[in-house]
């Protein structure tokens, strides 16, 4: 019998930009990663945004399997921009090591990074 996974994300709109806040503290297991991906994709299917902010302020650990969730979202929003904000040090380091974000704006990466939600919104509005 599979275990029920609590809701892992919630959506809001800030300045006409869809913001998905990941409510999980850790993403370690495949079923949790797939559930998170599916929740975010459902949000995207309902709002059909051209850009997205992922707020990872509550997330303090993401295992390698967790990146499947974020890459699935990236693939779904292929032509749009995704800015990740409020990353803890270890989460930021994992995204950087995996080259999913880049400290060099001239170097393309699948995701953009911002320190705060406000700076993520500002980045997408510029």
Where are these regions (language model features)?
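Conserved beta-strand segments of alpha/beta enzyme cores
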Residues: 10, 81, 110-112
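Broad hydrophobic/π-residue packing in well-ordered secondary structure
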Residues: 11, 58-61, 114, 123
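Short acidic-hydrophobic, aromatic-tinged amphipathic segments that line or gate anion-handling sites
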Residues: 106-120
